Amino acid sequence: MKKNSLKKILATTLTLALGAVALTGCGSASAKEGAAEQTSEASAAEEQSDSKVYRTLDEIKESGEINIGVFSDKNPFGYVDENGEYQGYDVYFANKLGEDLGVKINFVSTEAASRVEYLETGKVDIVLANFTVTEERAEKVDFALPYMNVALGVVSPEGKVIKDLSEIKADEQVIVISGTTAETYLEKNYPDIKLQKFDTYATAKTSFENGTGVAWANDNTEVIAYAIENKGYEVGIPSLGSQDTIAPAVSKGNSTLLEWINSEIESLGKENFFHADYEATLIDTYGKDYEETLVVEGGKVSDGAAAEASSESSEEASTSATSEAAEAATEASSAK
């Protein structure tokens, strides 16, 4: 009887002990899981924080400085004068942004191919470098409202003016700057034309003047300015492709800065600010004739520019439809 009682007591004690061990194990596992979960959440938060390369509007204001990417060699849009000061149409606008924001401006010299990269890495807060709005670029950066109209153009020597791209021979080259809409447009629509690409405006200009290419394709505002300032050259193709716009750009997702810039552009439009900008920086190059064509006030593209773009789109659609109809007719004739 005593032996049986002792066995029962030992069995009960052992069961309780094993239960306590099991509970301790569960508690330990639960604690480990909780700690792991907290670590994971902290890592995710840290990763998310690290992925934000841009500075918000408030952060810029708190720092007292803003970094704006501009060209340093593209007169009259962005260039450094003989006194080492930044000047030009884009710079005039940038100075106004800094003034109204109440911060110091740090100008950062950029090339066409670096504009997206500088925003993606947070090297600059805004790009104001003759930046044409395109769907491809809009996937990587956020564009604000436009402040200028633009199309593509082609300049060539007066002795051999290129008035149509079909005049370019198979062994001849067209000069473009890497990262520009001219490069993208020609590669997509004229893949047979050989392109000589350069990273900077200065090297492209020098190469063109040395006869490396039979023509230079760029924004029409730039090639027109080039032909006016350099004797012996003519813009044989003043408008190529569709009518586009120039706009400021910020890092993808920087909504606070983007909204402020849009509001600023709308407010400046009420003052005809961009006409004043044109007359201060561009009129010596283009004269009064181009002012209404190029300037966009308050982020609103004029009806004339919109109509021109619409007309070009309609013409392209009509040409495409005619071509398709002719092709269908040929196939039908062959079938007979």
Predicted segments — roles?
Residues 149-156, 224-265, 284-304:
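Periplasmic-binding protein-like
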Residues 49-51, 181-198, 235-239, 265-310:
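Ligand-binding clefts/hinges and TM-proximal coupling segments of bilobed small-molecule sensing domains
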